[in-house]
């Protein structure tokens, strides 16, 4: 092996040269990985819109392996103009030579010849219709053998019609041609058969829709039309001497009673044959049979009708299973295998399917052995062809057409001793064909027809022709020669590499551990002209096939840059001798993994010379890729015994820190505490290199930390995995203890179990009776203690007055007093029921469902027609306060009368003094004083006879009644509790709740979301106590007790245990206002006497005290008239002279 002299390249050219090598490698390895040369296609074009290429066949004139043979391609053009006179679109058969020209095909004479010797073509007869007969819809050929068998060509026109009186019958016809494409005979298998019932007989036979020429000189024609499109096949002997051959036409049973398929099955849409069961059999596709399609296999027989051997079923409705058939020996066992296409098969990502039934000891299985599928809407399998042995492995290969994948694609699948490979060896796309297109239009519907298994360029490899009818084109792809190569590696230094010892034989001064191996190959001679080949080889370490993202070793390229992929070009002699090239690699510093071998891949590819102008001039060879690469590995020196194989036995024990456990069942009450998992890992055998422990957990469980002390180093690898390093290596007979803390607070409410998958691994080989893995299951219990209470604001309410407002119609519009629309304050006092939930924990309540049964109205039969007697009239939808949530109640129960807030706008009311505007239902004032003003009216009036006076009188009474209500300040209140204590009378109490059937109750549902421990939520229900209902129904009771009931629970789906029973009742007490009842003012006589006596004693005591303090002593001024001494007094003296003891009295 001679490496190219890179050292002679100038420095400024090295980069360019290396880039060229990489480009060559990439092109060779990825672009053209098989031997059909799509870069140099030979394209033949027909007339536009003629459907040229709808059918194709490779053909050899002369003996297949003879010296004077002529290779050509036969192309059907069903809408082309035939050479027969008086026809325009009857279809034609074309013969295309093996040249590079586009337009050198010649039409083969088919129609119009009346006898063998005449060259004159006659127009169609009066009893036939050739227009649109689709001559060339089917073209088949088989090679001429040395014994004289084969070499025939069949071309059909399935729409050919003949005329009987005024009726036209589309029975179809086929021409059998000789090896040199001369007319031999015409086949019309349906001619002369009954047509009285039109399509129910043979009126639309359509013979020639499919055809096959078998290797036993048998011709099989398919006709899907007989007997209401049941279909049939026709088998005829076409080989050998005419006088000696069997001229009987054998057919399948298509009668109403015995046909293997039902009407509209299209049996005969495709045909093939082979020795599937050790003897000759014929297969026919019925793509519409049973809806999913079937393939019926008939045995060869000398009796009519030929017997049915077996039936294969499709797997999907409407998939057209059996639309196309092919026979090939895909595993080289000399037993034919059956391939069935279902081009209309589909899934969300697939369009079209091909099923392989591999022959096993002369038996076809009823279930397919391999299924191939194509891209969506590609109609993968619309064409199938046995294309021969492309790679010389004695197994025939398969071509599958997908004409509607883009502009068309053909897939090449290689056979092997194990069967057909499921991965295509080559994908030929119309958009990637090389060469020049003469009309500038891209080729479309590429792959509508395929033919092969003929060596058209005489290089001993079969070639392929592909039709594209939408572009009126046929594409010939020639097969490139395959060079056989043997690849090997000499790798002595790759055994027991010591990462602690630097250098190697080829680089002893290196500071890194290095190694050297030799890449070798040998090429057998394949051509006398080529004695030497340029090969590109690459050595890749560890990153191929996605083994690793980074490699532990590297190479130096020509620019001394580190790389794990080394690429070079060498020259190799094609003399079968082995030639080698040395490759030196280096181990990276601080490499931890010394247990796993280092894997390498050596791969060779051919550096091609420039393409020739034509595939007919020269085809560049291609390496056999199955032998062009080899994988090998290098091992490290380890302390693992003489066999250099480390066998470790890791044992895991797991235990959580949960005291509440039963056997292997653990239960954790979810609160603020953490979960600790104690893990013991023991190694009972050889040292475990890169020993690691992994704990997989749910995303809602978070890793907190690892408790100390421990020899392991743990980290969170991602949100669901904790990775711990146990040592490198973990020595024999050692145990590592790890305690890991987890916080389960993030678990979803639906997660009721914590699952931990705990496992250990090592780069050493694991041995032992069981794998080092354990599963820990911890049941999660959420408990929440809900403290549920409720109360009413106010607890007591009062009602009085008349029941005139009880009418729903009056309330909704205008009350009878004519004061305008009713308001909330007009119907009754406001009542609030408060429901409070307190979560005492320990767990969060993700959702609390509260259901309130609300006494909406008194019970009444809905069919009675009575108006609704509201009880607690809902003002609005209840609300959730303090916490998140909402309540739901049917809309028809929330303020159905559309009452506005406040009171009606009565002019008399608005003109009254502010201190007198105390309406009976103004609860904000009356509740605080525990006082509700009476609604009873006091008025008097005389009766009026006329209606107008009566109306005016009513209005006056209303005004007086209203003013009396709002101005009267003195009220006679009734306290039932004190009354009972005083006189011991029995109370008349009414209880209204949802459990006794006396009320119509509304269901209010409230959802309270996400209540953490020690949080509170409150639901407020605002309503009005409907005054008129109580006045009309309970005017003389002691009190009315109205209950709303509520329950609170957490849905079971959240897995939270509620520790208390949460059912409560909230009561509103309604009292009648008894202002007209007489007070009991009688006082016992004893109390009167004691009162008088007590009063007299008190008076005497007060009098005595006053006497003591001199209250009764009076001091008067000096007055002579009082003493009886009268004397005359000077006028100078004052009229009143003060005495000695003068006291001034003011």
From Swiss-Prot:
<keyword id="KW-0675">Receptor</keyword>
<feature type="glycosylation site" description="N-linked (GlcNAc...) asparagine">
    <location>
        <position position="928"/>
    </location>
</feature>
<dbReference type="GO" id="GO:0009925">
    <property type="term" value="C:basal plasma membrane"/>
</dbReference>
<feature type="glycosylation site" description="N-linked (GlcNAc...) asparagine">
    <location>
        <position position="761"/>
    </location>
</feature>
<dbReference type="Pfam" id="PF01839">
    <property type="entry name" value="FG-GAP"/>
</dbReference>
<feature type="repeat" description="FG-GAP 1">
    <location>
        <begin position="38"/>
        <end position="105"/>
    </location>
</feature>
<dbReference type="GO" id="GO:0007476">
    <property type="term" value="P:imaginal disc-derived wing morphogenesis"/>
</dbReference>
<keyword id="KW-0677">Repeat</keyword>
<dbReference type="GO" id="GO:0050839">
    <property type="term" value="F:cell adhesion molecule binding"/>
</dbReference>
<dbReference type="GO" id="GO:0007494">
    <property type="term" value="P:midgut development"/>
</dbReference>
<dbReference type="GO" id="GO:0007435">
    <property type="term" value="P:salivary gland morphogenesis"/>
</dbReference>
<dbReference type="GO" id="GO:0016203">
    <property type="term" value="P:muscle attachment"/>
</dbReference>
<feature type="glycosylation site" description="N-linked (GlcNAc...) asparagine">
    <location>
        <position position="1027"/>
    </location>
</feature>
<feature type="glycosylation site" description="N-linked (GlcNAc...) asparagine">
    <location>
        <position position="68"/>
    </location>
</feature>
<dbReference type="GO" id="GO:0009897">
    <property type="term" value="C:external side of plasma membrane"/>
</dbReference>
<feature type="repeat" description="FG-GAP 3">
    <location>
        <begin position="193"/>
        <end position="245"/>
    </location>
</feature>
<keyword id="KW-0165">Cleavage on pair of basic residues</keyword>
<feature type="repeat" description="FG-GAP 5">
    <location>
        <begin position="304"/>
        <end position="366"/>
    </location>
</feature>
<dbReference type="Pfam" id="PF20806">
    <property type="entry name" value="Integrin_A_Ig_3"/>
</dbReference>
<dbReference type="GO" id="GO:0008305">
    <property type="term" value="C:integrin complex"/>
</dbReference>
<comment type="similarity">
    <text>Belongs to the integrin alpha chain family.</text>
</comment>
<feature type="repeat" description="FG-GAP 7">
    <location>
        <begin position="432"/>
        <end position="494"/>
    </location>
</feature>
<dbReference type="GO" id="GO:0016328">
    <property type="term" value="C:lateral plasma membrane"/>
</dbReference>
<keyword id="KW-0130">Cell adhesion</keyword>
<feature type="transmembrane region" description="Helical">
    <location>
        <begin position="1086"/>
        <end position="1106"/>
    </location>
</feature>
<feature type="signal peptide">
    <location>
        <begin position="1"/>
        <end position="30"/>
    </location>
</feature>
<keyword id="KW-1015">Disulfide bond</keyword>
<feature type="glycosylation site" description="N-linked (GlcNAc...) asparagine">
    <location>
        <position position="657"/>
    </location>
</feature>
<dbReference type="GO" id="GO:0007155">
    <property type="term" value="P:cell adhesion"/>
</dbReference>
<dbReference type="GO" id="GO:0007411">
    <property type="term" value="P:axon guidance"/>
</dbReference>
<dbReference type="GO" id="GO:0035160">
    <property type="term" value="P:maintenance of epithelial integrity, open tracheal system"/>
</dbReference>
<keyword id="KW-1133">Transmembrane helix</keyword>
<dbReference type="InterPro" id="IPR018184">
    <property type="entry name" value="Integrin_alpha_C_CS"/>
</dbReference>
<dbReference type="GO" id="GO:0033627">
    <property type="term" value="P:cell adhesion mediated by integrin"/>
</dbReference>
<dbReference type="GO" id="GO:0007414">
    <property type="term" value="P:axonal defasciculation"/>
</dbReference>
<dbReference type="InterPro" id="IPR048285">
    <property type="entry name" value="Integrin_alpha_Ig-like_2"/>
</dbReference>
<dbReference type="InterPro" id="IPR048286">
    <property type="entry name" value="Integrin_alpha_Ig-like_3"/>
</dbReference>
<feature type="topological domain" description="Extracellular">
    <location>
        <begin position="31"/>
        <end position="1085"/>
    </location>
</feature>
<feature type="repeat" description="FG-GAP 6">
    <location>
        <begin position="367"/>
        <end position="422"/>
    </location>
</feature>
<keyword id="KW-0325">Glycoprotein</keyword>
<feature type="glycosylation site" description="N-linked (GlcNAc...) asparagine">
    <location>
        <position position="511"/>
    </location>
</feature>
<dbReference type="InterPro" id="IPR000413">
    <property type="entry name" value="Integrin_alpha"/>
</dbReference>
